[in-house]
């Protein structure tokens, strides 16, 4: 009876429903568990990233107890705590954590955020785009890149924690950008469609080598090569190797490398050169547009109507306003 009464007092909620100041309880996937030390006093605490279908939230375990030693990443736990805010972002102060049992009837897939389309559908969209290209060298390079990376591409996210950091997120990012590119190329019809589409497909492909992800689309860490070189350098290396393997024209190889090399636009963001061809310029803005719209849509979904979101780091720490006038069922 005591257990039942307590559950009636503490709401069971999804992360997207959390409100500052309330106590909550529920089942959450632990995406990461990190032991840290406070700057003052040297006290140990745990940083958690909790996740469900509706989003992620940072969890804090300030008082480490024996029960917390069982907390492991990529597992589901029953968590109880209080929702608070730090620097404009919601956090969960974890008070209790327990392992799930068979009686809880937990399905791991119910906690994994994933793209709104199947990976097979999205991969087919990319393959169809390549099939309809005119330049044989670009087609050969892309088909080989897709062949090499297909298995991991089916579940890899586009980032560890920023835009499209979900299962199948990299495919989703690419296919959305391809839709944008198709419309843009219809307006600016002097652009070489094959180059634009190829840039879209290739620009983040090396994130598969930059990050280490499990099949749930959760990135545990960056690879050694990814940390030392980054996906832009890794990407242009792969284009060079595959381009020579398929005997592609050296100019085509160079143009594709330039597309990847310049798509972050600024040196401080990883691009040593700015776009020097219009297709590369367009690629940059397609990338930025899709990333920002993804993050804004996510913020709106997590924010009540006529209220502002928490501060979104990837959007220059802006708070996004939900005016409630968006297209429904989208």
How would you describe each model-predicted region?
Residues 28, 74, 177, 287:
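Divalent metal-coordination and catalytic microenvironments
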Residues 105-225:
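Acidic/His-rich, divalent-metal-binding segments that scaffold phosphate/diphosphate chemistry
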């Amino acid at each position: 009876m005591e257990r039942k009464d307590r559950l009636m007092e503490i709401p069971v909620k999804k992360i997207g429903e959390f409100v500052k100041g309330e106590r909550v309880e529920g089942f959450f996937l632990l995406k990461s568990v990190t032991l840290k030390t406070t700057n003052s006093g040297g006290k140990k605490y745990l940083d958690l990233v909790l996740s469900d279908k509706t989003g992620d939230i940072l969890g804090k375990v300030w008082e480490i107890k024996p029960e917390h030693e069982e907390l492991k990443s990529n597992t589901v736990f029953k968590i109880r705590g209080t929702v608070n805010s730090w620097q404009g972002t919601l956090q969960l102060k974890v008070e209790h954590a327990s392992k799930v049992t068979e009686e809880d009837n937990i399905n791991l897939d119910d906690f994994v955020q994933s793209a709104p389309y199947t990976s097979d559908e999205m991969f087919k969209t990319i393959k169809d785009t390549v099939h309809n290209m005119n330049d044989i060298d670009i087609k050969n390079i892309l088909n080989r890149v897709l062949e090499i990376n297909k298995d991991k591409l089916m579940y890899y996210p586009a980032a560890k924690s920023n835009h499209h950091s979900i299962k199948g997120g990299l495919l989703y990012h690419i296919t959305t950008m391809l839709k944008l590119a198709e419309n843009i190329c219809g307006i600016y019809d002097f652009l070489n469609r094959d180059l634009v589409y190829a840039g879209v497909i290739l620009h983040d492909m090396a994130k598969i080598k930059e990050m280490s992800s499990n099949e749930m689309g959760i990135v545990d860490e960056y690879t050694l090569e990814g940390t030392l070189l980054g996906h832009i350098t890794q990407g242009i290396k792969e284009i060079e190797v595959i381009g020579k393997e398929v005997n592609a024209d050296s100019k085509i190889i160079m143009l594709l490398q330039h597309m990847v090399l310049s798509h972050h636009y600024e040196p401080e963001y990883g691009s040593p050169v700015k776009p020097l061809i219009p297709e590369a310029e367009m690629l940059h803005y397609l990338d930025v547009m899709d990333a920002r719209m993804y993050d804004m849509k996510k913020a709106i979904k997590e924010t009540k109507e006529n209220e502002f979101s928490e501060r979104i780091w990837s959007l220059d720490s802006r708070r996004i306003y939900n005016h409630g006038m968006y297209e429904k069922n989208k």
